[in-house]
Amino acid sequence: MTYPKRIPLNAWSDALKAAKPLIITFDAYNTLYATKLPVMEQYCIVGHKYGIKANPLTLTKNFPHVFKKLKENYPQYGKFSNIGPEEWWSSLIKNVFAPIEIPDEMVSEILLRFEGFDSYFVYPDLINFLKNVKARYPNIILGIISNTDPIFYKLLKNIGLYETFADNIYLSYELDLAKPDKAIFEYAFNDIIDKRPDLLKVYSKEEICQHCFHIGDELKNDLEGAEGAGWTGILLDRNDKYGYLSESLDKTVRDEYKLSLDKIDNHSIKTWETSSKQTDTIQLNKKKYVVSNLEVLEELFP
């Protein structure tokens, strides 16, 4: 087969489908959920209540440098620097607004806003995908592998997704491992097998690996990270930011600056409207796929 291969929605056949899924893990931010409005617009909405006049475009320009510096000075959200994740994010918020000084009460309100549906939107296709995949494969194991901090648990509970993934959540902060390193995928794999030894009565570990899938929105961390661990990687590219779906492959290289902006510049409702119209799947090789939405992805499985 020649790659990359474009597979229209009406062209799927048994020969094109992947293996039956036993384990599916997801990235978190911009995969399970995303911001309703760009992050800096939301910061400014809160700021307005406190008399702070700031331009979202200016804050957006400030963000990549502030984010990069904090990650370098206080890696893993401050875990090794005697500061907690909330203090780490508070510092980010204050530095993004600098030189404007903002009150602590405003910082607290911004943090609270980003703990649930005030800020976030859960894509409708995710809810349908989870429902359908559990109906088709009652013993499917669902999990999360994310480079994030424990504040995530509060958010996941508030948006109603915690119970779906509760037994299999793997965070970089807690494990001192991070995507795209295959070690975090291997840790998740071995932990799941330890919890579900019944799988080894039917499959070898090598065989189980052929039935593992990871879904996420970043090329390096999710698609290539999963492939490096022997899993099938699925790039969920709702905005075609990497260019595979439109065959604009000059877009595939995204540096740290662009990736930083991806984290804050999403308008998820508009993104959903756009992504739901794209129904092709791009297969890059036997272990890598690109889709625009999860409705399309259901066709991948037998």
Regions found by a protein language model. Give the residues of each.
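Asp-based, Mg2+/Mn2+-dependent phosphohydrolase catalytic module
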Residues: 1-22, 127, 131, 143-302
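N-terminal helical cap/lid subdomain that shapes the substrate entry/recognition surface
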Residues: 2-128, 134-138, 142, 150-154
